[in-house]
Design a protein with these regions (language model features):
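Polytopic membrane enzymes that build or remodel cell-surface glycoconjugates and lipids
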Residues: 1-266
Length: 266
C-alpha cells in the first residue's frame, strides 16, 4: 500500500493523465467520444481511457488514489485467480499459493505501481472474468451463458489487446483440467457433471472469440504501425524477431524464478 504515497511520474503518466486535457476534464461527453476514436499513445484502448477519466472525476489529481485504483484491480484479480483455480481443480491450498505468488511477485510491480499501466490490470480483470464465465458456461452451454464470455473478452481487449490468445487458453483449459476432450462426463469440484461436447463443437463454440481476437490484432497492428511502434522487416528481419521472442520467453521464465535486475525499460 506504500504506492498511495507515490506521485505522478513523467514517463507515460503525463500522456495518460496529467497532461491529457480529455482525461483531465473527467467523464464528459466529448471525452468519452474521444476515448472511442483516438489512437493516441499508439493504442486503441477506450476502456482504459474511461478508467483514467473516472479517476479524475472522483479524485481529481490526487495521485495516491490513482495508484489505489491499480491496487484495487490487482487485489480483485488475485481473488478472481484464486476462485478460478479452485473452481477448476478443487485444490484450495495449491490455488491459494499460486494466487499469493501472483499477488506479491516482483514482476507485477510495474503493472500495479505505475499509473500508466492501468491498462494491464484492467485487461487482466476482464480477462479473468471471461475465464470465470467460461467455467460457468461449460456446465450448461447456452447462449445466455456464452454472451458474458464474449462481452468480458471484448472489454479486456478494449483495455489492452494482450489477451488475444484467450481462445487458445480456453482450448487448453478444455484439455486440462476440464478434460472436455477425454471423458464422456465433465466433473467439477462441486460434484456436478455435464455431458461432454464433440471436439468439433469445442472449436465451433470459440469461433466468435477467434473473430474478435482477429479484429483486435488487425486494429492493434494498424495502430502500432501508424504510431511507429512496429519496425519494418527490412529493419528487423524475421529471424531476428524469432530469436528475440525465444530470448524474451527464456528471460521472463528465468525472472519468474529469480527476479533480479528488473528495469522499467523492457
Amino acid at each position: 500500500m506504500q504506492v498511495v504515497s507515490f506521485e505522478f511520474i513523467n514517463y507515460d503518466t503525463d500522456r495518460y493523465v496529467y497532461e491529457n486535457h480529455y482525461v483531465m476534464a473527467g467523464l464528459t461527453k466529448k471525452g468519452i467520444g474521444w476515448a472511442f476514436t483516438t489512437l493516441y499513445a499508439s493504442n486503441w484502448h477506450p476502456v482504459t481511457w474511461l478508467s483514467h477519466m473516472l479517476d479524475v472525476e472522483l479524485f481529481g489529481l490526487k495521485s495516491g488514489f490513482h495508484h489505489l485504483s491499480n491496487v484495487f484491480f490487482h487485489s480483485v484479480n488475485t481473488l478472481l485467480l484464486f476462485w478460478i483455480l479452485a473452481r477448476m481443480n478443487g485444490e484450495i491450498w495449491k490455488s491459494g499459493l499460486v494466487a499469493a505468488l501472483f499477488a506479491i511477485h516482483p514482476l507485477h510491480v510495474q503493472s500495479v505501481a505505475w499509473i500508466a499501466e492501468r491498462k494491464d490490470v484492467l485487461s487482466t480483470f476482464f480477462g479473468l472474468l471471461a475465464i470465470g464465465s467460461y467455467l460457468r458456461y461449460v456446465k450448461c452451454p447456452k447462449i445466455g451463458r456464452y454472451l458474458p464470455i464474449l462481452i468480458f473478452f471484448v472489454l479486456s481487449l478494449m483495455s489492452k489487446p494482450m489477451l488475444v490468445t484467450l481462445p487458445f487458453v480456453l482450448l487448453l483449459i478444455d484439455y486440462w483440467p476440464l478434460k472436455r476432450l477425454n471423458f464422456k462426463m465433465l466433473s467439477y469440484s462441486d460434484g456436478n457433471e455435464s455431458q461432454m461436447p464433440s471436439k468439433v463443437f469445442l472449436i465451433v463454440e470459440k469461433i466468435p472469440l477467434f473473430l474478435v481476437s482477429s479484429v483486435s490484432c488487425m486494429i492493434t497492428l494498424s495502430v502500432q504501425q501508424d504510431g511507429g511502434a512496429v519496425g519494418s522487416l527490412a529493419l528487423y528481419p524475421l529471424h531476428l524477431r524469432i530469436v528475440n521472442a525465444l530470448v524474451s520467453y527464456a528471460s521472463y521464465i528465468g525472472k519468474m524464478i529469480w527476479p533480479v535486475n528488473l528495469a522499467v525499460i523492457y
